[in-house]
Amino acid sequence: VSADGLQWSFIPRSGVTFSDGSPLTAAEIAVSLNLARISPLYSARFAGVTDIAAANGMVTVTLSRANGALPALLDIPIVKSGTEESLTPVGTGPYYFTTDEAGACLASHSGWWRGESRPAERIALSAARDREAILYQFSSHEVQLITADLIGTEPITATGNISYEDADTTVLQFLGFNTARA
């Protein structure tokens, strides 16, 4: 961090790879952060950012005014350049999207940089055409987890024998789990 707090430089963790095996670089991070600057979802976080650039293996973020909370605001998905417009962009997380004989799923990324075990090797995904279908799948135990946009125009609300869990995050999330067996 510069003395005036207007420039922050970050060195990417070494050994981090995308799920396709390619390395995470400062250039890849800068591309994702610059795309986030113009994204309706993340642009408010970048209100005080005047420049994001990659050079010499570092990402430098320049601010119009000092902001000690900048690192927390940069908690956004970093995706591989060229895949950002894809419905399934390539990332560095513990799981990646794929399809197999059983259908669409999130598969465990064996090269995940944290190296920690994951709760499941495969997480099956299920599509639903509307909120009623989502609630039906959840209440009939076809799916065990749903996410909901509680500030959307038609938030999903589930009732009955379910459990709500709170988790610290910089992004508002809601997870609902079935707690009874069918």
What are these regions (language model features)?
Residues 10-12, 18, 54, 63, ...:
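Hydrophobic residues in beta-strands and at strand termini
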Residues 16-22, 112-116, 181-182:
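Short helix-loop capping/hinge motifs at secondary-structure junctions, enriched
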Residues 48-52, 58, 93-96, 161-168:
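A structural signal for short loop-to-beta-strand junctions that line the ligand-binding cleft
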Residues 66-124, 129-133:
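Gly/Pro-rich hinge or "lid" segments in bacterial periplasmic/extracellular proteins
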Residues 98-105, 124-181:
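Extracellular/periplasmic solute-recognition and catalytic clefts
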